[in-house]
Design a protein with these regions (language model features):
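Class I S-adenosyl-L-methionine-dependent methyltransferase catalytic core
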Residues: 10-211, 215-278
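Amphipathic, charge-rich alpha-helical segments that serve as recognition/docking helices
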Residues: 1-9
Length: 278
């Protein structure tokens, strides 16, 4: 399957819903810390991305050809009015906390793990916040948001590639993606799927496997599905793991299963709901 995907190059598979459509957070997630979920060919682990043991369990003996990730980098996202960025509809408290977002320490530890993997392609968003622990690079990616909101007009990603600086233009106005269907964010650092797809086409055409150590709301996973790459996703928050699973299920129409017992996510969700009504 991986070889076929590489031969198909930049083709993109359409989903059953818009690629940036994200389910709402749930109060009582099915996922618990340590769970590994199987989503078609992909793997999702609820675990610590700074733990080499956890990453090895996620990879299950496979090697990551590409690392594409967006670590937390310890910056406040709340503006003076008490809103998150430019979205007047999204109040603080909509989001589950991001583990490690108080400092850049988690990002730095994760970068040390990434260095042990020797992936052919490494793309790390927010690399400008911890450039002192990254190797010098001639190839930074600039995401030009064409932004009229309160968030930054652009974001930077460090890469290990030898090419020149590249610019990706995609409108994302604060919390609202203005260029297409206006889907609201569920995760405060959520990025458009088109951004990951563009990076896959530009830098990862020969990469069959993609690792994201901070999967968040699951945009990287949806890009892997669309571009026929095998995704290995790590996310510490059980709440966001549930979002990722439901997002992938909505996009594909398929069922995720828990590796430990083979039960589907929907079966376990029904079990949870039954317990809560007892």
């Amino acid at each position: 399957d991986d070889e076929l995907a590489l031969l198909m190059g930049g083709e993109t598979t359409e989903g059953l819903v818009d690629e940036d459509q994200v389910p709402e957070l749930v109060d009582d997630p099915v996922t618990v810390l340590g769970d590994v979920w199987l989503l078609g060919n992909h793997r999702l682990m609820c675990g610590d991305s700074t733990s080499i043991d956890a990453v090895e369990r996620l990879m299950d003996g496979q090697k990551a050809d590409m690392v594409f990730t967006d670590p937390p980098y310890g910056i406040s996202i709340v503006n003076d009015s008490g809103h998150v960025g430019g979205d007047k509809l999204a109040k603080v408290g909509v989001y589950a906390p991001i583990a490690g977002d108080e400092t850049i320490d988690v990002a730095i530890e994760a970068i040390q793990v990434i260095k042990t993997l020797s992936a052919k392609v490494e793309i790390i968003w927010g690399g400008n916040y911890y450039a002192n622990v990254l190797d010098n690079s001639s190839c930074w990616i600039v995401w030009d948001k064409d932004n009229t909101g309160n968030f930054a007009d652009a974001e930077l990603a460090w890469t290990n590639q030898p090419t020149a600086v590249r610019i990706f233009k995609h409108t994302w106005n604060g919390m609202i993606k203005a260029s297409e269907h206006g889907q609201k964010r569920v995760h405060p650092t959520q990025k458009p799927v088109k951004l990951a797809e563009w990076c896959f086409d530009e830098y990862g055409e020969k990469c069959a496997t993609v690792l994201d150590l901070f999967c968040g709301s699951g945009s990287t996973l949806i890009a892997c599905e669309a571009k026929k790459k095998t995704g290995y996703m790590m996310e510490l928050s059980p709440h966001y793991c549930d979002v990722i699973i439901k997002r992938w299920q909505d996009f594909t129409g398929k069922q995720a299963t828990l590796e430990s017992n083979g039960k589907t996510y929907n079966e376990l969700l029904n079990d949870n709901q039954a317990k809560n009504t007892d």
